Curated annotation (Swiss-Prot):
GO terms for biological process: nucleotide biosynthetic process. Seems to play a negative regulatory role in 5-phosphoribose 1-diphosphate synthesis. This is Phosphoribosyl pyrophosphate synthase-associated protein 1. One of its GO terms (molecular function) is magnesium ion binding. Gene3D superfamilies: 3.40.50.2020. It comes from Mus musculus. Keywords: Acetylation, Nucleotide biosynthesis, Phosphoprotein. Belongs to the ribose-phosphate pyrophosphokinase family.
Length: 356
């Protein structure tokens, strides 16, 4: 390390054994020791964090993976960041491979943009930088008042396709829905493979026909000039499911950023099987797998589900041999090294497209 800069430490937020394991892999690659801290739940349910060594004037990196108990993991991260801030750490960088609440980054009716709220909370707790991977929406980076490095897992997943899928040249990249078409196209172009899109899978939201008016005058009942009436939207109809592209006699590789609704991937696999695909792979960066996921995957036409270790899924993997894991500790450790030494991050994005 550059002797002109301060030291650095890597801490695990200790939400799960998987978080500690990822932190150990990162520190081994960096040739560093894991910072000493204790994170535990008190008898009253509160989270307590104790930092067991001096961090004054150092760059601190907090590794936090997000298990199924999202809110506990978020509180662990916030409390640890605040503890390090009060201990006079120079910079506090959160290494959050899967950023929670990223699916709540848009306003929907009377909902809220929870992702923006979380960004504000992290800044208030003391974080000065975040390293994450494959944000669900790239616009989320604009929610933060400090730098966010959004790394990509696509080079690792592309390498897996080339090295672990026999006869991958006979494959076609599949988008489970039109929303995932750009990501699928990016994979298809770099592998020089065909592209298919499953259309009609997306569920339609219920149309709210109540206009919410309660105050006079009742304009709706008044005589108005033809053409000035507010147009009523037609009720949405769910289109029949179709596959745009040929998958007959091919290997189908479904790509997405998150697997959290396994049923939709199983349904897509069944459609592809009906269309003639003889092998089906599902690949995603984040595998947020429920307790039922192993059984659903095992009973489905899916041959393999390939995810990275951004989210803990060890128990599900033991229950289903179809689930495979790609380690991304290499890129996280290199990002930590470069940020601490003030080096450019451009090299980590050299094989990335805007649609990844």
């Amino acid at each position: 390390m550059n002797a002109a800069r301060t030291g650095y430490r890597v801490f695990s937020a200790n939400s799960t054994a998987a978080c500690t394991e990822l932190a150990k892999r990162i520190t081994e690659r960096l040739g560093a020791e894991l910072g000493k801290s204790v994170v535990y739940q008190e008898t009253n349910g509160e989270t307590r964090v104790e930092i067991k060594e001096s961090v004054r004037g150092q760059d601190i990196f907090i590794i936090q993976t997000i298990p199924r108990d999202v809110n506990t993991a978020v509180m662990e991260l916030l409390i640890m960041a605040y503890a390090l801030k009060t201990a006079c750490a120079r910079n506090i960088i959160g290494v959050i491979p899967y950023f929670p609440y990223s699916k709540q980054s848009k306003m929907r009716k009377r909902g809220s943009i929870v992702c923006k709220l979380l960004a504000s909370m992290l800044a208030k707790a003391g974080l000065t930088h975040i390293i994450t991977m494959d944000l669900h929406q790239k616009e989320i980076q604009g929610f933060f008042s400090f730098p966010v490095d959004n790394l990509r897992a696509s080079p690792f997943l592309l390498q897996y396709i080339q090295e672990e899928i026999p006869n991958y040249r006979n494959a076609v990249i599949v988008a489970k829905s039109p929303d995932a078409a750009k990501r699928a196209q990016s994979y298809a172009e770099r592998l020089r493979l065909g592209l298919a899109v499953i259309h009609g899978e997306a569920q339609c939201t219920e149309l709210d026909m109540d206009d919410g008016r309660h105050s006079p005058p009742m304009v709706k009942n008044a005589t108005v000039h033809p053409g000035l009436e507010l147009p009523l939207m037609m009720a949405k109809e769910k289109p029949p499911i179709t596959v745009v592209g040929d998958v007959g006699g091919r290997i189908a590789i479904i790509v997405d950023d998150i697997i959290d609704d396994v049923e939709s991937f199983v349904a897509a696999a069944e459609i592809l099987k009906e269309r003639g695909a003889y092998k089906i792979y599902v690949m995603a960066t984040h595998g947020i797998l429920s307790a039922e996921a192993p059984r659903l995957i095992e009973e489905s036409p899916i041959d393999e589900v390939v995810v990275t270790n951004t989210v803990p899924h060890e128990l599900q993997k033991l229950q289903c041999p179809k689930i495979k894991t790609v380690d991304i500790s290499l890129i996280l450790s290199e990002a930590i090294r470069r940020i601490h030494n003030g080096e450019s991050m451009a090299y980590l994005f050299r094989n990335i497209t805007v649609d990844d």
